[in-house]
Amino acid sequence: MKNKGLGEFEELVLLAVCILGDRAYGISVKKEVEKHSGRSVLLGAVHITLYRLQDKGFLKSEMGGNTEKRGDRRKRLFQVTNAGMKQLKAAQEVRQKMWQFIPQLKPGS
């Protein structure tokens, strides 16, 4: 995939996967993004984004075990890669640098 940067929604999804650790799968990521962003998101949008992030090398996935609760279906569990962590740290640094140049937010303003 050509574009290796992060869009805003991709960043939220990647952060949610980090927060969830070994419990990151479609629905749990959706709920985590909604909880922290305060907005409603579609499960389909989350799935597309998870796979796009995997294509970019920022996530890896494996199939979890099947459970009776899920009708003996398995769920795909996602994990952030080292490249994904680097990308998140880079995004955080850019945002912090830019925030410091907003006059209304400087100390004493």
Model-derived features with residue positions:
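Exposed loop/turn and edge beta-strand positions of beta-sandwich/beta-sheet ligand-binding modules
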Residues: 74
